[in-house]
């Protein structure tokens, strides 16, 4: 199954701003990506891993700092975010997706990231993850549906952010 957690790490002044979704085992993954000419560092890292591995164990997300338009340092920081998360979960880096949302042009405060990562737990609070990925949104967007297929009971869940600025 999957679990999630979210917390306040310090990317923002007061609100939750860091979280992850973790799978017990490698899960098939696909991506839909921007067609913009400017592509943020976390997207480059995640897109590369999705193409290489086709499976992931987790995605880790910070909000408040987008790590977009940050050049070589931003890309290095996104790979470091992936590596640190992989180390914490005991998996290969390509099993980790990374995402950042927030202010464009700012580098990730890596001490804040490392401290926040040390506090994330597997089997944390999924609602806190939904709060942690918000930027200008006014409400969380989540859904879960359980269906029975023969003898198997399957729960599908989703969490999203966005449209607050549109």
Segments from the language model and where they lie:
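Glycine- and acidic-rich phosphate- and metal-coordinating loops
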Residues: 57-64, 95-101
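Alpha-helical support elements that line or immediately flank enzyme active sites
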Residues: 60-89
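N-terminal amphipathic/basic leader segments beginning at the initiator methionine
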Residues: 1-38
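Glycine-rich, mobile lid/loop segments that gate access to catalytic sites or pores
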Residues: 79-80, 84-166
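Structured core elements
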Residues: 44, 60, 155-158
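Glycine-rich anion/phosphate-binding loops
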Residues: 35-44, 72-80
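Short, ordered loop/turn segments at secondary-structure junctions
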Residues: 25, 48, 64-66, 101-103
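Short, charged beta->alpha transition segments
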Residues: 42-52
């Amino acid at each position: 199954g999957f679990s999630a957690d979210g917390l306040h790490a310090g990317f923002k002044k007061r609100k939750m701003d860091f979280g992850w979704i973790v799978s017990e085992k490698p899960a098939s993954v696909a991506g839909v990506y921007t067609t913009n000419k400017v592509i943020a560092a976390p997207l480059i890292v995640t897109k590369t891993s999705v193409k290489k591995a086709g499976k992931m164990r987790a995605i880790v997300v910070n909000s408040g700092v987008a790590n977009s338009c940050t050049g070589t340092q931003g890309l290095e920081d996104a790979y470091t975010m992936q590596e640190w998360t992989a180390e914490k979960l005991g998996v290969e880096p390509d099993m980790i997706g990374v995402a950042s949302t927030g202010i464009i042009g700012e580098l990730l405060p890596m001490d804040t990231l490392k401290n926040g990562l040390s506090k994330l737990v597997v089997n944390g609070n999924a609602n806190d993850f939904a709060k942690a990925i918000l930027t200008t949104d006014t409400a969380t967007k989540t859904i879960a549906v359980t269906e029975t297929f023969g003898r198997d009971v399957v729960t599908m869940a989703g969490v999203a952010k966005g449209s607050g600025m549109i």
